[in-house]
Amino acid sequence: MNATKELTFNLLNKFQDKERFGSAQRHAGISLKGFISGILFSFLYFLFQLSLFIILRSRFKTIYQANVVLKIHPGSKVCFAKKKIKNYWSLFAFLKQLPGRMLDPMEKFERNERYGLDNYLFLRFLKLLIFFFAVLSIINIPILIPIHYFSRDILKENEGERYEQSFRTTSKLDKWTMSNLSPNSSNTLICHLFLSIFVVLWFHFILSSELRFVNRLGYSVLTKSKYQNILYLEGFSSKLVTQSISLETFFQPLHSDCFGVTHFIPKNLKKVHKLEIKLNKLQKSKEQIIFEIILEKYFRRVSIHRHLIANHKRFFFSKLKNHLLFQYKKLVFLTQFRISYYCTKIRLRWKKSSIFPLYYPKLYVNTETILERKYRILDKIIRKEKLIKFQVNSLKATSETKQALPDDLSSGTDIYMDKMFITFKSTLLSNVIGELLSYRLPTQNLKVIIGPNVNDIIWRNILDSSPLWKSAKYFSANILRIFVIIGWILPVAFLGLISQIPNISSLIPFTKIIHFQSPFIREVAKNLIPIVTLIIIIEIVPYFFRWLSYLRGLKTGAQIEADVQNWYFVFVFIHLFVVVTISSGFSIIIERLLNNPVSIPALLANDLPKCANFFCSFVLIRGMAYAGGNLLRIKELLFELFYYKWKRSTPHAQFKRLKTSLFFQLGSIYPIFSVLGCIGIIYSVVAPIILLLCCISFSMVFFSFSYLFKYQYNKENYSETFGKLYIQALMQLYAGIYFMEFCLLGLFTLFDQYTLSTIMLVVFALTVITHSKISKQIKSKPQRIPTLEYLSNLTEERKDQFCQESYTFHDIFSICRNSDEIWLPRDKLGISEEEQSFLEKSYHLKFDLNMYSMNLFGDCHLENSHLH
């Protein structure tokens, strides 16, 4: 007992002797060897990922070259299966084009781009950060690095202990930062002032030019985008429910002949959606059963016609290889589909006794064959599918019929909700009317969504009609967000515990296994483990914020992405930068600020230079880790090896996976690089070497995303915001500008350079005024209404692009739009044609045999180049 108390007392004393500073400050004084070793280890791991990716990209085309498989990339015209060397030349050609794309900061957006405007602007954001930091590195590094490095390290004793405590360096690495400045070199701070002003001016020049670019580009993209002539209205006057004539009269004064069709949301729509989900599952099951029947017949018939495999190759070893491969494929098929058959062949049934009023168990052996059982299941599925189709069509027909009923307010409010979709005959008029309705009076409870993509709508939140329940969810989500931001100090505090491993291992015997004896490994672990742990901790949070945005009742995925971006940026900036920099916990920050509210500049001036080594490592390691993960896609690779390789998926399922295996949720991607950009801005003067590291890091990430968009990404971005995420990301960089100005304000004060402090205070005030004006301009200016200058430059042909088609009830309200057409793979034995003929006569089903073909081993391959 006494030993336990003594151990606890020693441990607490050990930690109590340590200052309560941020975990990033423990990297102050790290040797140059330790810094380079951590970077080198991460770079070697990135090279390993890159090498593995180059080897695997030709073997797993569905993961790494989906666009080549889908025939939508120009390089797909080459037969990659016959000449695998072409894969490597294709990659080298892509690498050859990459520097030119990176050096062109004003690369234009092509309207036929598959990945949409938001994804294009994200690539532009990465390129913009590269260009922004490259210019700063060219100017700041040659000036500031010599000033920092050759400043005197030894301070005179009578010049004050506060400078010695705050700025004395312990390694060559710290000599590259402002930590190496002494009071005698305070005259050189004028260079830091001018360069910081240049950073602010350069940022505002980039910001203003990009805002103008996004506004011009957004208008041109809107003209050709689908669903942009639709308005969603909620809380409209109940007197207008079911009165299409009244609505048309309401909008007539705005513009003659602008009104299209009104679709009120019926209250039974939730029931329709449930039936559609069941119908979609039945359609997938039906296609899967038919596919299994074809495979069953194929493997039986090929076993009889073995010469098809034996004669496929001339040489003996080739014949043996084909035979073994066929037997392996057949074994996989049998283990996957016949186990369930034999499990249901013998059943236990309860039979009533003819003598006593009791039931007794009796074994029942199912005598039907595998094919008979599958045909019986298929017949049952088709009958159930027809019944659900009839129910869905009846409900839709009822809703569509009642849309055209005479005005009956009492019955209308019972049938419909106070929510509707209105289609207009022009995108421009729809956007203008939507913006006018958005500027409602405070007493009105009208909610407007302009141009919602019907595939992006979250119907559960739209169909939620209880005001009390919606308010409860909204306030609960906001409270939980605050708890997540504040309560995440526990995982971040764990990061501080990791950095205390040497202290723990010296006191607790069993923890010595994690205390490395090798000095080199210890330096690598000290530099690398906290960074990797911080990356993992930060990556978990977006899932919480996405769920909380859904809980708030947001009605489209685009709204959720914008909401997640704002909150996740706040979280990442606080925990990745503020908490890690200033202290090991959010509560300690509050405590220090409450005790001395005016100490913010001095606090930053003391702590920021000490954390320069940590963030220099973090920026580069984060970029390499993100780029390597983007290319290798380890999760998809593991699923391919251990799940899809053993699963016989239908052609429709394989095609859907090709199109949807890669998608980006930009709301949780933008904040990561916005915060890294803020860190680069903050340390652009304090530790200018970070500017070069930011360029390298963002270039690697840009390379990985460029490859994904060119060779892999082909999914339509339903959650398109038309540049809103990009504008928010640019405005979030102001956080880096403010913290840089605060830090320099504190540094100038600590060096008794009050003239420089006054100038920096004026710069800070001008930054706040400029930021306020730009924010007001963005909020007050309607983002979807073109300027008069843009409209005056439109030709008659381009004006016609504003005209949009009308949408039916099914187009808007259906959540499952799968075709009834069944895809079957065409085989050389003609089994698919036989099955098609039989099922068309028996059940009047529709088939397509031109999309996929089946090889000799039962594997399906895409044949057609059409995207569905």
From Swiss-Prot:
Chief place of localization: membrane
Residues with attached carbohydrate: N2, N184, N503
Keyword Glycoprotein recorded: yes
Topological category with respect to the lipid bilayer: Multi-pass membrane protein
Residues passing through the membrane, by range: 35-55, 128-148, 188-208, 482-502, 528-548, 570-590, 612-632, 661-683, 693-713, 731-751, 754-774
Stretches of the chain found on the membrane's Cytoplasmic side: 56-127, 209-481, 549-569, 633-660, 714-730, 775-868
Cross-referenced InterPro entries: Csc1-like, CSC1/OSCA1-like_7TM, Csc1/OSCA1-like_N
Extracellular domain ranges by topology: 1-34, 149-187, 503-527, 591-611, 684-692, 752-753
Its job: Acts as an osmosensitive calcium-permeable cation channel. Required for spore wall assembly and ascus formation.
Protein name: Sporulation-specific protein 75
Lineage of source species: Eukaryota, Fungi, Dikarya, Ascomycota, Saccharomycotina
Gene coding for it: SPO75
